[in-house]
Amino acid sequence: MVMRVGLLGLGTVGSGTAKILLDPAHRHPLVGQIELARVGVRSLDKPRSVAIEGDRLTTDLESIVADPTIDVVVEVMGGLEPARSLILKAIAHGKHVVTANKAVIARYGDEIFTAANEAGIYVMLEAAVAGGIPVIQPLKQALGVNRIRAVTGIINGTTNYILTRMQREGGDFESILADAQRLGYAEADPSADVDGLDAADKIAILASLAFGGRIKLSEVYSEGIRHVTTADIAYADRLGFVIKLLAIARRDGEFDETSDQSLDQLQLRVHPTLVPVSHPLASVNDVYNAILIEGDPIGQVMFFGPGAGEGPTASAVVSDLLNLAANLRAGTTPKATNPLLACSHQHYCKVSPMADIVSRFYVRLLAEDEPGVIGKLGLCFGRHQVSLESIVQIGQHETRAEIVIVSHEVTESNFQTALDELREYREIHSVASVLRVL
């Protein structure tokens, strides 16, 4: 039984997907049973890296999603519209969907999966998170017997590349960002990457799968790396840390063994973090991604690999097609989707406000270089139940001392209240940097 595919988009990922489907030799035999039937593009005249016969190409994307001979629609166009509308129309016409579009899934997943579940349709999204790293299906299947406690990841290659080079070379953010743009690792408008928005989309998807509930993207805290300086990276190194942009989804509290649903709250946050050099994620460098999953009884397992690019992302797209082809050959009936492939949860996860999050903190500040300042800092933190691991004068700028503080675990609200008080002190010139510590 041949499965006919309509491909929407023939850019980097679309071209990579087409190359695999048109060259099935020495791959799984089922790849040869997947036919690239039609390809939708914006322009027929654009030069492309893959040769597609003219009768397969069309600029009429809606005709593909409505074509009764198409079994699966692959959406790799990117952007929110018309991608969202075309996915919904494909579902309405009874087509299964494979997408690499994390922005659409993170924002419109409710609408899309509700429609898919009602229609008995699969929406597959292995390529939407971390490119070539196979993590979506393991979360649904191999790790499904575990009670997941946390998902922590480096899931944006652009920011990891920038921070890695800042660490190695001591270069500043702006100059390395410009290099990343020239090399194609960063977009002309890098905001989604460097401001943490891309990672927020991805951790929302991973959290939904890991914790079995829907996620409101607006409840994911996101903070980027623009304010990370070479001074912070150097001081972190002296303290035994590296700075990484981490995406964190963590379950607060214990499991309720009387219920099949966990009603406790989740932490959902993206921010630059001081990571101990001994931690598995500390050695993930350049454009590589990694996702560390903690669960019971498995303990810790980490997925590592390329997070983007034509080959890795296309591999993930075709892996979803392979799963669909195998499932359709097995003959599941309409309205009875395989629960290990479908996303059928309906309830929303409860998300803890940032004020309630417990974390360690790193602070760098400039203060007047005079007796009693460090003691005054310690007293202020103590009044707000902030216990300090270390407080040291690490440098000097003219008449001002540069002081670095690392706290023990404390609630975000208590720590920020202490900082607000410090900023009012005559002796404190500025709070130059505040970062969380893993």
Predicted regions mapped to residue ranges:
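N-terminal glycine-/serine-/threonine-rich beta1-alpha1-beta2 phosphate-ribose binding loop
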Residues: 1-93
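Glycine-rich phosphate/pyrophosphate-binding beta-alpha loops
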Residues: 277, 301, 305-311
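Rossmann-like NAD(P)H-binding beta-loop-alpha module
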Residues: 117-198, 205
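Substrate-binding/catalytic subdomain of NAD(P)-dependent oxidoreductase enzymes
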Residues: 175-283, 287-290
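Rossmann-fold NAD(P)-binding glycine/threonine-rich loop
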Residues: 83-93, 102-140
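Short, ordered loop/turn segments at secondary-structure junctions
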Residues: 42-44, 78, 102-104, 110, ...
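A short hydrophobic/small-residue beta-strand
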Residues: 96-98, 388
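A conserved regulatory-domain signal marking ACT and ACT-like small-molecule sensing domains
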Residues: 316, 321, 325-438
